[in-house]
């Protein structure tokens, strides 16, 4: 078993890692335990009561975080004609049609998110095996396939986050930087949970929000009492 470093041991000194904390306290502890020398990202891991191997229990979507992610998002826009100008004016970092697709085929992946107009999707599909595994494939469900390409680009640049449940029924979603502080991170957290709750599949049975934890990039996982999350949403 790998040994944890001094910073990690120092971070967990006064924390019970087996306990479930009220969400506001959990967020404060998460920020407090971040001891790395860089501005760590705070993530939430959600265990959902779904079985993603069934298509009617897949949870996939996107949410615009009120305070963004605290980092520059590089966006690739697959489009042509006037839409290229629209995408560039909205702030897309890389814009093109077949030329950009060819570039990706040759190994170019220097972007964090991708958008496309519907008329480009047949061509973009040819690089689906490259984009898909990296979470970069444009998708209508997340608003990244649209003729309103300017809006799609603007939302991503402003901190729109895409998410998709994994095979184990777990969602990992970034909430922003530790330097945001507990209050802003809690605002972003609320936006994420709101979006996830709205996407609850009708086929999902039993408890939907089964467990969750917060953590910084290098820090310990702080377990969250899901009942306190429900109260947060109601409040």
Swiss-Prot record:
GO cellular component: a single term: large ribosomal subunit
Keyword annotations: Repressor, Ribonucleoprotein, Ribosomal protein, RNA-binding, rRNA-binding, Translation regulation, tRNA-binding
rRNA-binding recorded as keyword: yes
GO molecular function: rRNA binding; structural constituent of ribosome; tRNA binding
Keyword Mitochondrion recorded: no
Role: Binds directly to 23S rRNA. The L1 stalk is quite mobile in the ribosome, and is involved in E site tRNA release.
Family indicated by similarity: Belongs to the universal ribosomal protein uL1 family.
Subunit field text: Part of the 50S ribosomal subunit.
Protein name per its UniProtKB record: Large ribosomal subunit protein uL1
Native species: Solidesulfovibrio magneticus (strain ATCC 700980 / DSM 13731 / RS-1)
């Amino acid at each position: 078993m790998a040994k944890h470093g001094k910073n990690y041991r120092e971070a967990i000194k006064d924390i019970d890692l087996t306990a479930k904390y009220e969400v506001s306290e959990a967020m404060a502890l998460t920020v407090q335990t971040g001891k790395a020398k860089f501005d760590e990202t705070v993530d939430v891991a959600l265990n959902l009561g779904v079985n993603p191997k069934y298509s009617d229990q897949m949870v996939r979507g996107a949410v615009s975080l009120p305070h963004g992610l605290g980092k520059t998002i590089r966006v690739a826009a697959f489009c042509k004609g006037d839409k290229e100008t629209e995408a560039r004016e909205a702030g897309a970092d890389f814009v093109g049609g077949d030329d950009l697709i060819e570039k990706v085929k040759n190994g170019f992946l220097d972007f964090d998110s991708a958008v496309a107009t519907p008329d480009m999707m047949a061509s973009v599909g040819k690089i689906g095996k490259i984009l898909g595994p990296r979470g970069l494939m444009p998708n209508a469900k997340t608003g990244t396939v649209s003729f309103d390409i300017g809006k799609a680009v603007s939302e991503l640049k402003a901190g729109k986050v895409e998410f998709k449940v994994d095979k184990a029924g777990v969602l990992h979603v970034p909430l922003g930087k530790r330097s945001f502080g507990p209050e802003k991170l809690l605002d972003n957290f609320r936006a994420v949970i709101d979006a996830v709750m709205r996407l609850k599949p009708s086929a999902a049975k039993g408890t939907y929000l089964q467990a969750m934890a917060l953590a910084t990039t290098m820090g310990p996982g702080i377990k969250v009492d899901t009942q306190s999350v429900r109260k947060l949403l109601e409040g």
